[in-house]
Amino acid sequence: MITFQDVSKTYAQGGHPALSGVSLSVKAGEVFGVIGASGAGKSTLIRLINGLETPSAGQVIVDGDDVAALGVAGLRALRRRVGMIFQHFNLLSGKTVAQNVAFPLKLAGRPAAEVKARTAELLERVGLSAHAGKYPAQLSGGQKQRVGIARALATNPKVLLCDEATSALDPETTEQILDLIAGLNRELGLTIVLITHEMDVVRRVCDRVAVLDAGRVVEEGAVEEVFLHPASDTARRFVREAEGDVTAAPGVGGRVVRLTFKGEATYKPVLGEVARATGVDYSILGGRIHRLRETPYGQLTLALTGGDVAAAIAQFQAAGVRVDALSGETAQ
């Protein structure tokens, strides 16, 4: 659906490349995350998809079209197929909720009856039918983002671009908006590109993710692989921030390891079985259970002492548990 072929972008002012040699593909119907720190090039990347920016080198192909080669009419048609939602909502303050949602339909010259019916349908989908006559100033942040989503869907796009769509929201509202986005992907088959600086957002809704650092893709793959086995320093930093950077507390001895359980292994009593079999004692330094979309996984950070620690690590691994050494000898 979307392909970047060795894309670079350098702005005239400053001359520093915002993107350098970016190549990636987004499959039709998937939720693709792009994560990076501020200034990594995320917003530039997403603006290249709908032609708000043009590449300095390389090609951006969207639904079969070379975006940079499109004329005015072609870009207008592309933007009807590519909806976008923003961090700060970008609503028209002088128009009601219904008028904001109807705006792109009116610009497209749709008949009044169609505009009215489509607007009502979209407001129902995002749960705002009762707020159709309100103005943006009367809405909460989450409600404003729902209006933005409804407006982005007005022209039945194939692609939805989400530029930091939850970063201005509180945690509970973020969960609700992510649930809505995931539902749109499931129910409408939308291809979604989600820009964020939060690994927790990626884990919650994305199928695959690209990690950007200083304008370059430093890692790309399935969310499960990148989250549980990050290969780049940048990805490891984001995972630590999402999980909590647990290291040995002062005075804690032994070998400190992180155990990662995935799928059904998450709920099995592996820890007790290994401790009994090997005589190893353990102190729990941290732990949590989460989901990568629908797949449960758990992580425990332990200090292992006494007994046969090497045998304990081998037994964990034989049970399908990943073991990462955080201090002491390296686990295999």
Swiss-Prot record:
Its membrane topology: Peripheral membrane protein
GO terms of molecular function: ABC-type D-methionine transporter activity; ATP binding; ATP hydrolysis activity
Principal localisation: membrane
Catalytic activity: L-methionine(out) + ATP + H2O = L-methionine(in) + ADP + phosphate + H(+); D-methionine(out) + ATP + H2O = D-methionine(in) + ADP + phosphate + H(+)
Domain ABC transporter residue range list: 2-239
Record's keyword annotation contains NADP: no
One Pfam short name: ABC_tran
Keywords linked to the UniProt accession: Amino-acid transport, ATP-binding, Cell inner membrane, Cell membrane, Membrane, Nucleotide-binding, Translocase, Transport
Matching SMART domains: AAA (SM00382), NIL (SM00930)
EC assignment: 7.4.2.11
InterPro entries per record: AAA+_ATPase, ABC_transporter-like_ATP-bd, ABC_transporter-like_CS, ACT-like_dom_sf, MetN_ABC, MetN_ABC_transporter-like, NIL_domain, P-loop_NTPase
Top EC class, one word: translocase
Location(s) in or outside the cell: Cell inner membrane
Cellular component aspect of the GO annotation: plasma membrane
List of residues binding ATP: G36, A37, S38, G39, A40, G41, K42, S43
Family according to the record: Belongs to the ABC transporter superfamily. Methionine importer (TC 3.A.1.24) family.
Function text: Part of the ABC transporter complex MetNIQ involved in methionine import. Responsible for energy coupling to the transport system.
The protein's assembly and partners: The complex is composed of two ATP-binding proteins (MetN), two transmembrane proteins (MetI) and a solute-binding protein (MetQ).
Family annotation (PANTHER family): AMINO ACID IMPORT ATP-BINDING PROTEIN, METHIONINE IMPORT ATP-BINDING PROTEIN METN
Protein name stated in the entry: Methionine import ATP-binding protein MetN
